[in-house]
A protein has these predicted regions:
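Glycine-rich phosphate-binding loop of ATP-dependent small-molecule kinases
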Residues: 1-278, 282-292
Length: 292
């Protein structure tokens, strides 16, 4: 019996080594809520109903009991590291210069009416740099996040960069993972707070038209940025460039590789990588991970 149990364990070992869940659904569908549940440290901290051991009313109760007991035993539960797709979109802004960002805000202002645009630019700079800025012209040629730009350069120049990292690189690997899963989320939320309260009106292309759309500036801005990245590989360029439609998902995959590499180095032969992507909105991006 023990041999059979060991054989089953061996069969499912590969699945246990690496689990990647890509959440998908419209905004407000509950993807972020699910991601928070998956990133919970301990299964006992989850607000789950008790599982039955007998007197099942229907098959779903029985299935729930089996899954619950399986996950609760032998410390099988391990929290998932969450990669927030919107924050990875935001990273494309941070790796560039302030001038790129200013120019893109100017470009957006040709599409929607942004009041006090120059003041908004100044506020954004102060949020991103965490410093008081009197004259934004003085810093416009600076890269917003130099460290991020260096990391991206390494990833672009060497497709095997993550796989080449060794135990002596653990500190750097941890630093990169923390940046992409925590620090950049904080930076994006600060940026969001500056734009989220601003409502903008679409500039009418037809002077006779009385109907114009109204948008939340943050949502409009990030949607445009995401579309451009998927189209050209650059957040400020809306041209269609063949091969660039997977630019965003390739970066997400680089972060997946980082998390998996850290697990390999820290727990050799006992790896249990758990990753959740919140969220995939594009069918090509979903297929990209399915193919892997």
């Amino acid at each position: 019996m023990k041999d059979k149990a060991d054989a089953v364990k061996c069969l499912y070992r590969q699945r246990d080594k690496f689990i990647l869940i890509g959440l998908t659904g419209r905004t407000g569908a509950g993807c972020t809520t699910v991601a928070k549940i998956l990133s919970t440290d301990n299964i006992n901290e989850l607000d789950l109903k008790d599982s039955k051991t007998c007197d099942f009313k229907h098959s779903d109760e029985r299935k729930y009991s089996i899954v619950y007991r399986f996950m609760a035993e032998d410390e099988r539960w391990k929290k998932f590291t969450v990669i927030e797709a919107s924050s990875i979109i935001f990273s494309f802004i941070l790796q560039g210069t302030y001038k790129n960002l200013f120019n893109y805000i100017d470009k957006i202002s040709n599409e929607v009416e942004i009041k006090e645009k120059e003041e908004l630019k100044k506020n954004i700079v102060e949020v991103l740099s965490e410093e008081k800025v009197e004259n934004i012209k003085e810093i416009e040629n600076e890269v917003i996040d130099k460290q991020l730009a260096d990391w991206i350069k390494n990833l672009n120049n060497n497709p095997k960069y993550v796989e080449s990292l060794k135990k002596e690189n653990l500190e750097q690997l941890n630093k990169m993972i923390k940046y992409f899963t925590e620090n950049i989320v904080t930076a994006k939320n600060k940026f969001k707070n500056k734009l989220d309260t601003i409502t903008v009106q679409e500039k009418s292309k037809n002077s006779k038209s009385q109907n114009t759309n109204v948008y939340n500036l943050y949502s409009y801005f990030m949607q445009s940025v995401g579309n451009n990245i998927r189209s050209s590989g650059e957040y400020y360029n809306n041209s269609e460039v063949i091969g660039k439609e997977i630019t965003l998902v390739e970066r997400i995959n680089d972060i997946v590789k980082m998390i998996n590499r850290l697990e390999e180095l820290q727990n050799k032969d006992k790896e249990r990588t758990r990753i959740c992507i919140d969220a995939l909105r594009n069918s090509f991006e979903i297929q990209y991970f399915r193919d892997r």
